[in-house]
Amino acid sequence: MDGVVTDLITVGLKRGSDELLSSGIINGPFTMNSSTPSTANGNDSKKFKRDRPPCSPSRVLHLRKIPCDVTEAEIISLGLPFGKVTNLLMLKGKSQAFLEMASEEAAVTMVNYYTPITPHLRSQPVYIQYSNHRELKTDNLPNQARAQAALQAVSAVQSGSLALSGGPSNEGTVLPGQSPVLRIIIENLFYPVTLEVLHQIFSKFGTVLKIITFTKNNQFQALLQYADPVNAHYAKMALDGQNIYNACCTLRIDFSKLTSLNVKYNNDKSRDFTRLDLPTGDGQPSLEPPMAAAFGAPGIISSPYAGAAGFAPAIGFPQATGLSVPAVPGALGPLTITSSAVTGRMAIPGASGIPGNSVLLVTNLNPDLITPHGLFILFGVYGDVHRVKIMFNKKENALVQMADANQAQLAMNHLSGQRLYGKVLRATLSKHQAVQLPREGQEDQGLTKDFSNSPLHRFKKPGSKNFQNIFPPSATLHLSNIPPSVTVDDLKNLFIEAGCSVKAFKFFQKDRKMALIQLGSVEEAIQALIELHNHDLGENHHLRVSFSKSTI
């Protein structure tokens, strides 16, 4: 460890703590300990202790186990989707690096993203943690010329003033005034491509704000708006020409002449991820005339990535089961989503990086109202829940074990941040690999339940249509399995008695076994689903409740 300490103090790292490199690895297999000599070179042969608490968030991040031949630009590329990278310190001899983001918020977003999804550089996993240091001071230090050159190049690209290739050509660069909107055409559309599929793929390269899908000239097309033109550039650079599914659904990506999208409705054709309050509308949204005209425009077409001097085309995103964006410079393979995705079992990016981690830690629950059964019903919307454990001594926390890591990721993505019984639920991946049942005679108060063989599992049948009807929580619920004798008033009164305010209701015209009911808020709908899913309606019919993608 002395070697690391000496090197870091020599290069002028501004210390925020007396401990150096002592915090726990956020997404690594073990915790680094400052007293263990082998942390200097990332030696896996040593056993690392788990006796150190994680560092508090810092805009300086510590990267471990970086490849010995990695470039400065490749390290920088890990941080670019999350914000501006302001400094870099490489310790190649120790397979380590320090990356400084412009803000602590950007660093937190980056760590949160890479917690369940281990990033790869040159096909090698890289582990990221907060540093004890609050700032990197590398002025006038030897061997920093390459790092500073890479940072300056990236800064120039982000401001649109320099070609990535370092020459006069504008090929593969972010042009001045380049649009954050991409125009996407799907060729060889053998399998359906949904708005959710596009969001999953393109969100790997930055924050997706809006998507509009449409069909023109018998081709499925989309307009997709990023928060930043740089994100759009990287997405086009990596994804243009790639296949979504094996040997089909090829992405053809151009830059749009539009600089912003006007989304009027949130439905299966269009989505504004910044405006969850938008109505569903009927069918394809109406478009403003300039936008409609733009559908036929070629857009600002940038040439394929020409290869930058020292700048990696790969953004360092992890390979995953199914959908993968390899992080090997210059080698972008197909985005092959496994065939199981066609039946709804799409691989969630990064889930393969946490084998067997199907347990979620759910926090900030209302201890007076939450029950294991309630969590089973709610999380069961997004996968088959096997076990639930509410903490005996801290009843606002619980563990939820899903059938697999994909389902855990899906439930976490949809439910974390939702309000439930007056509190904002938080869900993260747990360090536990399974929920243990209480030993015989152990006091538990019924807080641990095994639902492994529950008949209420929604996804136990392979290829079930339920896989195609997974939607985020909304104020509108989809009701099914309604017997013929049950009336509109019967169902309205059922929800009113459960404490809900019913705003609208309608039966499906072609099938009165199904209906939509719109409640006063998303929180009301979540609580109603917990309360009334599987409610006995008589005539051997139990009500089925799920979130709807539609509004009334």
Curated annotation (Swiss-Prot):
Keywords: Acetylation, Differentiation, Erythrocyte maturation, Isopeptide bond, mRNA processing, mRNA splicing, Phosphoprotein, Repeat, Repressor, RNA-binding, Ubl conjugation. GO terms for molecular function: mRNA binding; RNA binding. Interacts with THBS4 (via the acidic amphipathic C-terminus). The modification N6-acetyllysine is found at K423. Residues 59-143, 182-258, 358-432, 475-550 form the RRM domain. Expressed in several hematopoietic cell lines examined. This is Polypyrimidine tract-binding protein 3.
